[in-house]
Amino acid sequence: MIILPFVFRAADNGLDLAPWQPLQTREMVMATVNLEAEPGPLSVDLHKSALVIIDMQRDFLEPGGFGAALGNDVSRLRAAVVPCREVLGAARRVGMLVIHTREGHRPDLTDAPPHKVLRGDPANRIGARGPMGRILVRGEPGHDIIPELYPLPGEPVIDKPGKGAFYQTDLELMLRNRGIDTLFVCGVTTEVCVNTTVREANDRGFRCIVLSDCCASYFPEFHAAGLAMIKAQGGIFGSVAGSKPLLNSLAGVP
């Protein structure tokens, strides 16, 4: 005997039964692309892939933000903006799931560990007031994503209190619900939030492909080391690829 699942649905005379159908939240692309990467070439099912753009926030990338207040050269992070924008446009065109993340805290800082809040110069600490509002506080202008990569309506935004995008968020649930097993990862900084997120994802069974020119660091040597650690020993945490091979592959998807 076969038991078919049913759901209740609204009807003029109350409720009736309808056959259950899986929820479609986006137009799926049934396509497999081949991608040159390190440590080796990959075959990727776009139906099971998502683009995760990490922390491309004004506080990190714009003059007057948190990163600049710490004495960093924000132009080094902005080098990733154009490649990210190109990949984002291609991912949207083929219907890939796009997820954005932002690091920041509640206005009362109850979700921020004391040692994190007390780090550094008191004038530039998390929660202090800067040119773009309170530093790394949710709802402030500096906390938001830069205009060049701003999320479209319907694109999920993960607000995270830590370095990794899985810690204290519903990112894993979101990916599991959509059948995602592969993540294309972009964002900043390579050695901190990108690396932490990739390691978290790897431990949860997701395959990660880090797009090297779509990531950046205030310190070029940290960027290089972060990428090297991901692809080391046969891809211990994931793979590394440039954006151009991915763009070329996506260009062939109708």
List the predicted regions and their residue ranges.
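Active-site-adjacent betaalpha module
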Residues: 2-50, 59, 77, 86-94, ...
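A short alpha/beta connector and helix-capping loop motif
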Residues: 65-91, 96-97
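Short catalytic/ligand-binding loop motif for oxyanion handling, primarily in non-cytosolic enzymes
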Residues: 106-110
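Beta-hairpin (beta-strand-turn-beta-strand) motif
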Residues: 103-104, 161
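Short beta-strand segments at enzyme active-site cores
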Residues: 96-103, 211
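Short, contiguous, helix-prone interaction/anchoring segments in small proteins
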Residues: 49-67
